[in-house]
Amino acid sequence: MAYRKMLKSKIHRACVTQADLDYEGSITISPELLKAANILPYEAVNVWNITAGTRFETYAITGEKGSTDICVNGAAAHLVTPGDLVIIASFTQILEEDCAAHEPTVVFVDQFNRLKEIRPERIGVKNKIPCSA
């Protein structure tokens, strides 16, 4: 059986609110956004910084319920600045024969990181949202 690594979900254009160099590595995300993106606590995620062009892998930890904070912790805090726009992506392994039917989930947030929309990924669709920290 052959598997492919496929995009499972992403939180699109979240705004970094904090960067905490002194905290152990991770990215803090509200439980509401984690649930919407089907990301578990301690699950590996890729973070792509739209503003700075940097990329890194870390793991998600659960923030406070109702919070709109996106906090990059540990050494990765060097790669972001509060106000940066990021994409937070999770991946899964899928049997090759199931890949054609796979639809990743995209979680859109507003400029304050509040949940705006959840939908399957659509190739070629653009959704520009300004970031106001």
From Swiss-Prot:
- Tell me the enzyme class: lyase
Q: In which pathway does it act?
A: Cofactor biosynthesis; (R)-pantothenate biosynthesis; beta-alanine from L-aspartate: step 1/1
Q: How is it modified after translation?
A: Is synthesized initially as an inactive proenzyme, which is activated by self-cleavage at a specific serine bond to produce a beta-subunit with a hydroxyl group at its C-terminus and an alpha-subunit with a pyruvoyl group at its N-terminus.
Keyword flag Calcium: no
Q: In Gene Ontology terms, what is a biological process of this protein?
A: alanine biosynthetic process
Where do the catalytic residues lie? 26, 59
Q: Keywords of this protein's UniProt record, alphabetized?
A: Autocatalytic cleavage, Cytoplasm, Decarboxylase, Lyase, Pantothenate biosynthesis, Pyruvate, Schiff base, Zymogen
Pfam families, per the entry: Asp_decarbox
According to its UniProt record, the EC number is: 4.1.1.11
Which SUPFAM superfamilies is this protein grouped with? ADC-like (SSF50692)
The principal localisation class reads cytoplasm
Question: Any S-S bridges, and between which cysteines?
Answer: none
Any one of the GO CC terms:
cytosol
Cofactor stoichiometry and binding?
Binds 1 pyruvoyl group covalently per subunit.
What CDD domains does its record include?
Asp_decarbox
Q: Cofactors per UniProt?
A: pyruvate
Write out the catalysed reaction.
L-aspartate + H(+) = beta-alanine + CO2
Q: Which InterPro entries match?
A: Asp_de-COase-like_dom_sf, Asp_decarbox
Where does this protein hold substrate?
58, 74-76
Q: Which family does it belong to?
A: Belongs to the PanD family.
| Protein name listed in UniProt | Aspartate 1-decarboxylase
